[in-house]
Amino acid sequence: FFGYRMEVNRNYLKDFPIDKYVDFVVQRQHTAWDWTKAEQHGKWIESAYLSAIQRNDKALLDKARTMLKRIVDSQEESGYVGATSKDYRSDERPVRGMDAYELYFVFHAFITVYEETGDKASLAAAEKLADYYLKYFGPGKLEFWPSDLRDPENRHKSIDALSQFAGHGVHYSWEGTLLCDPIARLYEVTGKKKYLDWSLWVVGNIDKWSGWDAFSRLDSVADGTLGVDKLQPYVHSHTFQMNFMGFLRLYRITGDKSLFRKVAGAWDDICNRQMYITGGVSVAEHYEHGYVKPVSGNVVETCATMSWMQLTQMLLELTGESKYADAMERLMMNHVFAAQDCESGTCRYHTAPNGTKPHDYFHGPDCCTASGHRIISLLPTFFYAENGKDFYINQYLPSRYDGKDFAFEISGNYPESESMVLTVLSSKNKNKILNLRIPSWCKAPEVSVNGERVSGIEAGKYLAITRKWE
């Protein structure tokens, strides 16, 4: 099932008319507000590279390399590589309102390509783009205000405007501050402190820019005294989750536990109140009050599915707590592929648990069609993890893993059948510790090694199997 749906996704990426969207970017004539054309190339590049590498698909990889080269070659000397017209931009207005959101995915695409292939040109392009933002935004420079109001006049004011630099004003600066994530990631890759300092500056000003102390009040969410939906007048799921990933990245770098607490507390609140039984989140793209989760209409946005999955994976990596892997399993088994047309590969904008969608509902491309292909391409990066001698099986599906010093395969028809067989094929490190996720929903888990039952199994935990593998 997984392999087939990933193949459908790969074929969709091959056939997707990415040329015209790359044309749109490199021609650089865009002045309108619309963002859907200018976010396609970033998501497609990352998706295509990952999908091609996973299956050694030369045709797709060649196409991805060609498109990437066109984009990188078009980068201006200043570092700008978005779609906005040069005539539109100036020192006082160096970006379009939706540039930050569009370029978020370009940043991640460049860095992913570098990490997967070692392509230094991609890393250089990411640095040049980051330096463009650092040149114009920072202490004493331009800031991510969501409207013309400034502190303190913006305190507790509802906004319905289009921000000059931070996307939709109704996001209260968070559609600009989301750049803290890829630029902090750039610090992780390069070690250049200017990128860390800039990301910390961004996060440190969210309260001021939003006018609602939305960042600080995440502590109240963590305390259980405030719902995440009450942080500001409109809490856009996908946008908040992109920012949350930046906060977690900064926690990983700095060790600031307050950042982790904010995000983990928000995740718990969302999971307990706003996550559907199918694992998805968002009602008309935002978080609702109480336990309101309509099962029809515009609910469970695919962009939110993508960032919720990524955010949950980051929390799993940081904590090793299986509740995060359980949530990812629920989402992966249900809403991720429910959003995909199993024939054409196109992904939906919203996927309600109830009702039907006509064939022509698969429109686009838009933000969500591209997000659907990106999350499917990212899936293999969530299945397993390795940390020194420890190897973690986070998700169960028929598959084969061939690592540098460890190889195994999993067979069985999970989840239709709850029995799976994991066969270790080779292990150069004979003392590898195999950590198996025991799902919390599994009431009577059983594990055997070479026919011998293992004791001490606890649902909702990882079971560590230590032995000398042959």
Could you tell me what each predicted segment is?
Residues 1-470:
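Glycan-recognition and catalytic cores of secretory/periplasmic carbohydrate-active enzymes
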